[in-house]
Structures are given as C-alpha cells and as structure tokens.
Amino acid sequence: MAFRCFFDVDGVVLDFESSFIKVVGDYFKLEVPENYQPGNWFFSDLLTWEQVEEGWEYFLKSSDFENIPPLVDPERFNDIFGAYPVHFVTNIPPDCLERRQRNLEKVGYRFSSAHCAGLVQYDGHPGQTNAELIQDLLEDNEGFMFVDDHPDNCINVHENFPDAEVWLMSRAHNQDFNHPVIRRALHWDDIMKHPREV
C-alpha cells in the first residue's frame, strides 16, 4: 500500500515556542523564566491577548520567523521518513509560506511539499482544514500518518480518516487531552520507532 506522511511544522518539526517567546520577550522587554513552557495555546500566563497579537505581527516580519531551529534531527528524520512523500502543514498566513519553506530547507528537512491549512483562518485567506488538504493530496488506497501538537487538528483528521495513523505531539498546552485512538507522542522516538505496515 502506498503511504504518505503529513507533519505540522510549528511545535512539531520546528521549535516555534522558544523562538516566538524569545522574540516577543525581547520586544516587550519581559523577564521570561528560563525554560518557560506556555501553559496554554495563547501564552496567556505570560502575555495579554493584545501582546500576543502585536507580538505575532512583529514575529512574522522578523528574520527569526525563517530561522526557527528544528525539534528533531533533520538527518534522522529524512532517514526514517524519506522513503515516503513528506508534506508539511502549517497554520500561518499563506503569504508567509515561502519563508517557512526556506526555513525547513535551510535546517535540512527533505519534503515533497508544504501547505497552509488548519483551524485558524486569516483575513482575506479562505483556508482548508488539515483533513481537506489531506483529501486533496491523497491518491486512491493510500495510507498516511499525521502528526500535530494541536488536539483539534488531530480530531479533525481522525474524524475524517478513522483508519489513519494520527499522533498528538506532547506539549505543555495539550496535556489535558486524551483520546482512545489518537496516539500521544512524548518524544519523537515514539513516532520514529513505531512499527507501521506500509
């Protein structure tokens, strides 16, 4: 059976949180605790909603946006998943996608394509859910795996493809999520060492 791999970018293959917090912390002159981990998706234990919005706009324009370090060794990632088409999915404004692709290429990931999809919609950019994007890319009788750090994206894919291999990458902000079928990865090794029949 043919097989494809779909990976979220920020928080799964690139260390978005650390990069964003460093840039925004410097921008607002915040004293961010060492090894800070956000307690929720919107960093509300550190930032006001207005700071998140302003900081996000600043981050998008910064050079740091396209210099985010990897969360998994790209060489090892390529060795394990390089036999399959790899598609990266990111929920950023579509006009930033080219810069994100450059970032992924620069750190050494090999991939077939990168796309914008997810549950956050940006003004003037009608978006797709992850499941809709996957449906567009799959060919007949193909299996796939999907990895994301947001429970809602994992649920979206699982509900539309109940036989797919869906993983939630553990982060501080998703610790309360439990699901009988969606797998939780504590570390990349959980995904890399999982046996698959493809």
Segments (PLM) and residue ranges:
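Short acidic-hydrophobic, aromatic-tinged amphipathic segments that line or gate anion-handling sites
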Residues: A114-H115, V181-I191
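Short, acidic loop-to-helix structural element flanking the phosphoryl-transfer center
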Residues: E57-F88, I92-Q101
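Short amphipathic alpha-helix with an adjacent loop that forms part of the alpha/beta core around
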Residues: A131-E139, D189-V198
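Short, basic/glycine-rich phosphate-binding loops at helix/coil junctions
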Residues: D45-K61, F111-H115
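Short, charged, surface-exposed secondary-structure boundary motifs
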Residues: Y122-G127, Q175-I182, R196
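Active-site neighborhood of HAD-like aspartate-dependent phosphohydrolases
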Residues: M1-E54
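Acidic, Mg2+-coordinating phosphoryl-transfer loop and its flanking beta/alpha structural elements
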Residues: M145-L186
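Substrate-recognition "cap/lid" segment bordering the active-site pocket of phosphatases
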Residues: P94-F144, C154-H158
